[in-house]
Curated annotation (Swiss-Prot):
Its EC number is 2.7.11.1. GO terms for molecular function: ATP binding; protein kinase activity; protein serine kinase activity; protein serine/threonine kinase activity. ATP binds at V113, A114, K115, G116, S117, F118, G119, T120, V121, K136. This is Ribosomal protein S6 kinase-related protein. The active site is at D229. It holds the Pfam family Pkinase. The lineage of its organism: Eukaryota, Metazoa, Chordata, Craniata, Vertebrata.
Length: 410
């Protein structure tokens, strides 16, 4: 889950919603106590109706039967349980199946990894597997408010199809009364946090990360998948220092030759054709890679963030990214070919990278790349403290409130 939020815009000519990302902010993911307004998602007493029920009636949602919901009867003796009507279960099937309650015997929360406007990511211990995972928790009411049911389901559907060593693997997904849960392998840090700490990367590390990302993007594009949000915050680093591409929330199946029109992603990483509202294709991901590599090499973004996509498009179109003369000639050429305004002339195919001067001597093989050490990453990870405190839950869905009031930092 990135730190960037998107807001709904108007429908495009292709019927898609326009989602415009807020400019990149320093500091990565937001941490700290949750706003008290979120408390209403877990507490519904007596005549207080579920947020989900009220939202459903207001929406007149077209996915399922639109029968009106009756108000909950008044019971003075004890409060009514706030259990969503069947529509709120069926709506997220089959990508989010209903499972027996994961509770104290299976999952224990180790800490809070990150929190954004759409949900939170928790570090959990699976007591059965004796392994640590990251669980993305998304309130159903937020999904309905933002009309992102399809987006959430497609995120899980895409991740189930992917099997690649440089992709953050999906462990499980399920739904509770009020939340959707996506469980993945746990990584202790991300590329943005490392970049914020060390600034410019050594050329050897840039070459290794670039090769790993090239393999990932080529793999996804061969499957017809556009990621659409390639950025440092969405690249996790494993215990050996190698990357794992994550967050497929904006990804979409786009067959070769087809085009997309949705304005989505993170402003400073978005290609000119995306900022202008399309049409665009898989070449947009390669522009994002160029922005990322430029930042690793220079310690800054090629173009400063603007307030919206219109201003960002003007900046990208009318300003040439000055590549420092001190950079390796091969790296300078690579950046020029990735940050090409015309997507038709942009570097994009695996064989082009294999013969590129910057990658001379690099074997584009995942197993061989994983054997190469990334010392400064592992050394940085070794200095990070970890929390030994855990919080067991009887009901992983309903008991989240107590943790969110007093989160344990991961």
């Amino acid at each position: 889950m990135g730190a960037v939020s998107c807001r709904q815009g108007q429908h495009t000519q292709q019927g898609e919603h326009t989602r415009v990302a807020v400019p990149h902010k320093q500091g990565g993911n937001i941490r700290g106590p949750w706003a008290r307004g979120w408390k209403s998602l877990w507490t519904g007493l007596g005549t207080i109706r579920s947020d989900l029920e009220e939202l459903w009636e207001l929406r007149g949602h077209h996915y399922l039967h639109q029968e009106s919901l009756k108000p909950a009867p008044v019971l003075v003796e004890k409060p009514l349980p706030e259990w969503p009507v069947p529509q709120f279960i069926n709506l997220f099937l089959p990508e989010f199946p209903i499972r027996p309650i994961r509770g104290q015997q299976q999952l224990k929360i180790l800490g809070l990894v990150a929190k954004g406007s759409f949900g939170t990511v928790l570090k959990v211990l699976d007591c059965t597997q004796k392994a640590v995972f990251a669980v993305k928790v998304v309130p159903k009411v937020k999904v309905l408010q933002r009309d992102t049911v399809r987006q959430c389901k497609e995120e899980v559907s895409i991740q189930r199809q992917i099997n690649h060593p440089f992709v953050h693997s999906l462990g499980d997904s399920w739904q509770g009364k009020r939340h959707l849960f996506i469980m993945c392998s746990y990584c202790s840090t991300d590329l943005y946090s490392l970049w914020s700490a060390v600034g410019c990367f050594p050329e050897a590390s840039i070459r290794l990360f670039a090769a790993e990302l090239v393999l990932v993007l080529c793999y996804l594009h061969d499957l017809g998948i556009m990621h659409r949000d390639v950025k440092m915050e969405n690249i996790l680093l494993d215990e050996r220092g190698h990357l794992k591409l994550t967050d497929f929330g904006l990804s979409r199946h786009v067959p070769q030759g087809a085009q997309a029109y949705t304005i989505c992603g993170t402003l400073q990483y978005m290609a000119p054709e995306v900022l202008s509202g399309g049409p665009y294709n898989h070449a947009a991901d390669w522009w994002s890679l160029g922005v990322l590599l430029f930042s690793l090499a220079t310690g800054k973004f090629p173009v400063a963030a603007e307030r919206d996509h219109v201003a960002m498009l003007a900046s990208v179109t009318h300003s040439d990214s000055e590549i420092p003369a001190s950079l390796n000639q091969g790296l300078s050429l690579l950046l020029h070919e990735l940050l090409c305004q015309n997507p038709l002339h942009r570097l994009r195919y695996l064989h082009h990278f294999q013969v590129h001067p910057f990658f001379r001597g690099v074997a584009f093989d995942p197993e061989l790349l994983q054997k190469q050490p990334v010392n400064f990453v592992t050394e940085t990870q070794a200095t990070q403290p970890s929390s030994a405190e855990t919080m067991p839950f009887d009901d992983f869905d309903c008991d989240l409130e107590s943790f969110l009031l007093y989160p344990i930092p991961a």
